[in-house]
Regions:
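Signature of uroporphyrinogen-III synthase
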Residues: 13-219
């Protein structure tokens, strides 16, 4: 059975480690390659309070595209993988909108002018409407996503099209990690997307789930 809490990772640790019955906490990290390492950098002060288990639930497969992207178009990255996919297309575009602080940092270091950034697609749409760009926009996204930002932009009078830049291939939880998760120890599992939640339900169960992305709780 799942117990979901919309909270920060710090609140999750406080709730579980303050309870004398909740010992030997497991932090289960399920992001694709590179994602778990980036996440740990943001919570280094908490890592000594738990055992970290690394078991990605997705393998990212980058896809080729025959779609021509005009150099003056504004790119939209709603994930780091969208940005990584664009690098494989050797695009010369200089401006972008992004979702996520890490995505913003990487885009900036790659030479992009980040016109606006937000924590989720819903708020990014609001920011784009405020910026009111006249250029065409290109959303480089994964095959499986929540919501449709491009359609929302077109419905608001903007020019936008999509490129499916990568596929998220499902992976099962590693067998040895699955046994630890099922051992009865308290588990904190950060969830960043509805897709990740559905994959988890398909593969295993955990006694405690902390939702980082508020959109997951609305699903």
């Amino acid at each position: 059975m799942f117990h979901c809490i919309a909270a920060s990772i710090g609140v999750a640790f406080q709730n579980m480690t303050n309870n004398p019955d909740q010992k030997n906490v497991i932090l289960l990290l399920t992001r694709p390659e590179g994602g778990n390492e980036r996440f740990c950098l943001n919570i280094e002060h908490l890592l000594g309070q738990c055992e970290i288990l690394d078991s990605p639930l997705q393998k990212i497969e980058f896809l080729e595209t025959l779609i021509e992207v005009k150099e003056e178009s504004i790119l939209i990255f709603t994930s780091i993988n969208g940005l990584r996919a664009s690098e494989k297309y050797n695009l010369r575009n200089k401006k972008c909108f992004v979702v996520g602080e890490n995505t913003r940092k990487i885009a900036t270091s790659a030479g992009y002018e980040v016109l606006a950034s937000s924590s989720d697609q819903e708020n990014l749409l609001k920011l784009i409407k405020l910026k009111n760009p006249t250029e065409s926009m290109v959303h480089i996204r994964g095959k499986h996503t929540t919501g449709n930002l491009c359609d929302s932009l077109k419905n608001n009078g903007f020019s936008c099209f999509e490129i499916t830049g990568y596929n998220q291939q499902p992976l099962k939880i590693k067998k040895q990690i699955f046994h630890k998760v099922k051992s009865g120890r308290p588990v904190i599992l950060p969830i960043f997307s509805l897709i990740k939640l559905l994959l988890l339900i398909y593969t295993a169960s955990a006694p405690e789930i902390i939702s980082i992305n508020s959109l997951v709780m609305k699903a």
